[in-house]
């Protein structure tokens, strides 16, 4: 978080957390889509690799599409297709022929900064990981230990149902996770106290102003100091 926000909040801390109730606020806003749609891409990650038996199944409609084999020397990536469905499956067989890492499957990709990726033999060829990027900022959704061996075939499968993600390696579940949609409250708030003061903190992360009334029960004749911090959009 921004330095000035942290400084302001750390200078205004109480010893006791107070009960806070709200009334009259709008319902939280759920952001984004309830499905993961976009480009599907396959990559040989710091290795030479072959990909075949590539198939995408739209489980919602029953439509099945197959694709040509792929082969990369010393890395490479290809767009397989784009899908807009709430339930689908991506299947392929992968084999590393040289190199020291593994494979990556990109899905739900709208651009290079907004996507989800499945690493098979990621981070020094030591894991199977599902990672989501939003505006270039990455988050690990699920991680397990796994290594890719040269010359060995791996039957890989990704299933996406709504925002539920499950990956399989050779028929066994490798990752299971949910890429949850952000939920934005109208106002975030807390209150605390010490021997002399009551501290009320409120944060509005929306792009519109909010007018609210603060009622402090059991306290008369309040003298208040208000500190307000605002800034420009991060975009």
Tell what function each PLM region has.
Residues 6, 200, 226:
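Hydrophobic, well-ordered secondary-structure elements that form the walls
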Residues 16-19, 113-119, 231-235:
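Acidic Ser/Thr/Pro-rich low-complexity disordered segments
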Residues 1, 207-210, 233-235:
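Flexible loop/turn segments at secondary-structure boundaries
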Residues 27-183:
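Extracellular glycan-recognition regions
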Residues 1-30, 181-187:
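Aromatic/acidic polysaccharide-binding cleft in carbohydrate-active enzymes
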Residues 220-235:
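Acidic, Ser/Thr/Pro-rich beta/coil linker or hinge segments at domain junctions
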Residues 185-220:
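Carbohydrate-binding surface patches
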Residues 165-167, 214, 224-226:
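Short beta-strand elements bearing conserved aromatic residues within extracellular beta-rich modules
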